[in-house]
C-alpha cells in the first residue's frame, strides 16, 4: 500500500484488513543461512565481558552491515529439522577446519546453506561452496547424507562469483532428486533449487482462495497465471 500510494502515486479508495496467518512460528518452507568468519557481536556479548574466541557464524545478515552475520542457535521460522541440519553442518565444518566465508576478502570455503521443507514432508538442502575442493565437498555431503536420511534432495553448488546468487550456477545433485514435491488443494508442484514458491505455504493457499473469490470465476472461464511465480529450475 505504501509503495502504491507514496511512490507510484496511485489512489486507493479502500484498503481491506490484513489477512493474518494462523501460524506465526515454523511457517516458512524455505530459509537461507549465510556462513561468515565475522559474526555480529550482540549487546549481551559486550555486556558479559567474555572473550569471544569463535567469530564464525552461520545465520542471517545484519541490516546495514553486509559483512556481519548473526549466529543462530535456534530459529523459530522453520521446522526444527532446519535447526538440526544447520547446527550439524556448522559443527562439522568447524571440526574439520573448513573456513567460513569472508565476503570482503572473498576467501573461505563455506558460503551459504538453503533449506526447503515442503508440506508433503519432502526436504531439500543446498550447500554452496566458494571453491571446487572436491574432497572436502564430498566429505561434508557424505556426512550430511548419513546424518539426515530424511533429506530427499541433497544438492550443492560451487559459486566462485562475488555475489551469492546461484541463479546462473550449476546445481549438482549429490543424492536423491533435483526437486521436491509441493501440494496445494490437490495440485502437485515440482520445486527445484532455483524455483520461487510462496514461503508460507498455508498462507499462500489462503491468498489464492481470496483471489479466486474476488475473481468470481465460472467453471468455463479460461484463466491465465501471468505472475510465473512457480517454475521448475
Describe the role of every protein-language-model region.
Residues 1-232:
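Accessory RNA-recognition modules of RNA-modification enzymes
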Amino acid at each position: 500500500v505504501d509503495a502504491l500510494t507514496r511512490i507510484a502515486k496511485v489512489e486507493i479508495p479502500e484498503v481491506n484488513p490484513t489477512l493474518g496467518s494462523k501460524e506465526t512460528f515454523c511457517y516458512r518452507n524455505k530459509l537461507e543461512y549465510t556462513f561468515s568468519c565475522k559474526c555480529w557481536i550482540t549487546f549481551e556479548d559486550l555486556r558479559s565481558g567474555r572473550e569471544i574466541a569463535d567469530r564464525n557464524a552461520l545465520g542471517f545478515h545484519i541490516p546495514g552491515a553486509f559483512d556481519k552475520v548473526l549466529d543462530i542457535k535456534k530459529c523459530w521460522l522453520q521446522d526444527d529439522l532446519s535447526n538440526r541440519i544447520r547446527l550439524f553442518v556448522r559443527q562439522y565444518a568447524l571440526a574439520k577446519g573448513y573456513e567460513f566465508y569472508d565476503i570482503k576478502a572473498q576467501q573461505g570455503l563455506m558460503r551459504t546453506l538453503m533449506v526447503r521443507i515442503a508440506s508433503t514432508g519432502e526436504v531439500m538442502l543446498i550447500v554452496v561452496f566458494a571453491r571446487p575442493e572436491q574432497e572436502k565437498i564430498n566429505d561434508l555431503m557424505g556426512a550430511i547424507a548419513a546424518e539426515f536420511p530424511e533429506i530427499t534432495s541433497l544438492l550443492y553448488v560451487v559459486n566462485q562469483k562475488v555475489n551469492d546468487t546461484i541463479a546462473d550456477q550449476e546445481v549438482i545433485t549429490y543424492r536423491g532428486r533435483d526437486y521436491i514435491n509441493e501440494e496445494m488443494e490437490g495440485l502437485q508442484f515440482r520445486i527445484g533449487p532455483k524455483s520461487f514458491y510462496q514461503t508460507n505455504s498455508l498462507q499462500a493457499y489462503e491468498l489464492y482462495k481470496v483471489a479466486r473469490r474476488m475473481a468470481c470465476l465460472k467453471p468455463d472461464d479460461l484463466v491465465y497465471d501471468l505472475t510465473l511465480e512457480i517454475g521448475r529450475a
